[in-house]
A protein has these predicted regions:
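Hydrophobic, small-residue-rich alpha-helical packing segments that form membrane-like cores
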Residues: 261-270
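Inhibitory N-terminal propeptides of secreted protease zymogens
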Residues: 21-138
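A general structural signal for stabilizing positions within well-ordered secondary structure
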Residues: 86, 108, 169, 234-236, ...
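Subtilisin-like serine protease catalytic core
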Residues: 22-24, 40, 153, 163-258
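Protease zymogen maturation seam
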Residues: 110-175, 188-192
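Short alpha-helical segments and helix-capping/turn motifs at coil-helix boundaries
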Residues: 10, 101-103, 161-165, 227-229, ...
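Bacterial Sec-dependent N-terminal signal peptides
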Residues: 1-24
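Solvent-exposed, acidic/flexible segments
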Residues: 64-71, 101, 155-158, 214-218, ...
Length: 270
C-alpha cells in the first residue's frame, strides 16, 4: 500500500508543478521596454554589420530605437527567474524563454520589467536526426539537358519576364538575398548549386545545427533563384549572394513560428 501512496504523491507533485516528463515549455515574454543595453544610435556599427549600415545609408534608412538590442540585464533577470532565453526580438521587445516548468510564466509575469507572458510552444527540446556526415554522396542530374539554356526553369522565367533582364546583364550580381524557409536539405550536395555564392547559413529553430538536413522546401525555392546549370535549370538570380536561414519547425504548428520568422528577419536585416 505504501508503494502506491508513494507513486501517487510523485505524480501529484509533477502535476502541481506543471511539469510533464520529457516536455518543455516556451513562453513569449513581452517587455515594458528594452532597458539600457549600453548601445546608442550614434554608433550603429557596434550592433549592426558593416553591410547593414552601408545598405541603410545607400537606401536612406535611418537607424532607430527598434535597432537597439535588448539589455543583457533583462535577459539575465528572466534567466534568474527560471526562464532560459532562446529567442529575442529587438523590434517587438519580446523574449522567448524555455522552461520545463509551465508555472514559470506566472513568476515572470510578476517581474517589474515584464508587461505580459504568452505560451507559444510545448514539446521535446531534442529532435532532429543528424545526417551521417561521413556520407559524401553527390547528387548529379539524371535528366537530359533541354534545348533552352534555362532548362526546366524556362516557363517560370518567361512568366516573370526575366529573360530580358538576363539579356540586359541583370542576373543578381552584387545583390545579397536571404532565403528564409523550413530547411535546405542537401543543397551542399546537389550539383546545380555547385556555383552557389553562399555567404552563410543560420538555424533559428535549432541553433548550431545544419540547415542542410530535414525539410527540403527551401531547397526547391533556392533552385528557382540560384540554380546555375545551363540546359537543366537556371534560376532568376544565379549571380546573387545568398544567406540560407531556417525559420520553421516543420514537425508541428505553434505560435512560436511567429518568433522564429521574426528572428530570421532581424538576423537578415542586421
Amino acid at each position: 500500500m505504501s508503494k502506491y501512496i508513494g507513486i501517487f504523491v510523485f505524480v501529484f507533485s509533477l502535476f502541481s508543478l506543471g511539469v510533464h516528463a520529457g516536455e518543455s515549455f516556451r513562453f513569449r515574454v513581452y517587455l515594458k521596454d528594452k532597458g539600457d543595453s549600453g548601445y546608442t544610435l550614434d554608433n550603429p556599427e557596434e550592433y549592426l554589420s558593416k553591410e547593414s549600415v552601408e545598405r541603410r545609408n545607400r537606401q536612406g534608412i535611418s537607424v532607430s530605437e527598434s535597432d537597439l538590442p535588448i539589455a543583457q540585464a533583462y535577459l539575465d533577470t528572466l534567466s534568474a527567474n527560471g526562464g532560459k532565453p532562446v529567442l529575442e526580438s529587438k523590434w517587438f521587445s519580446t523574449v522567448v524563454v524555455s522552461s520545463p516548468d509551465s508555472l514559470v510564466a506566472e513568476r515572470l509575469s510578476r517581474l517589474p520589467i515584464v508587461d505580459s507572458v504568452k505560451w507559444v510552444w510545448k514539446g521535446d527540446e531534442e529532435i532532429d536526426i543528424p545526417r551521417e556526415e561521413k556520407d559524401t554522396t553527390r547528387f548529379m542530374p539524371i535528366d537530359k539537358p533541354e534545348k533552352s539554356p534555362y532548362g526546366y526553369a524556362e516557363e517560370q522565367i518567361k512568366m516573370l519576364n526575366g529573360i530580358k533582364l538576363h539579356e540586359a546583364g541583370f542576373k543578381g550580381e552584387g545583390m545579397r538575398v536571404a532565403v528564409v524557409d523550413a530547411g535546405f536539405m542537401n543543397v551542399d550536395r546537389i550539383s546545380v548549386f555547385d556555383s552557389l555564392r553562399l555567404l552563410g547559413t543560420h538555424n533559428v529553430v535549432f541553433p548550431g545545427r545544419s540547415v542542410f538536413i530535414g525539410d527540403d522546401h527551401g531547397t526547391k525555392v533556392l533552385s528557382c533563384l540560384a540554380a546555375d546549370a545551363p540546359g537543366l535549370m537556371v534560376g532568376t538570380a544565379p549571380q546573387a549572394e545568398y544567406w540560407l536561414i531556417k525559420s520553421e519547425d516543420s514537425r508541428s504548428e505553434f505560435p512560436i513560428e511567429e518568433d522564429y520568422w521574426t528572428a530570421a528577419m532581424e538576423f537578415a536585416d542586421s
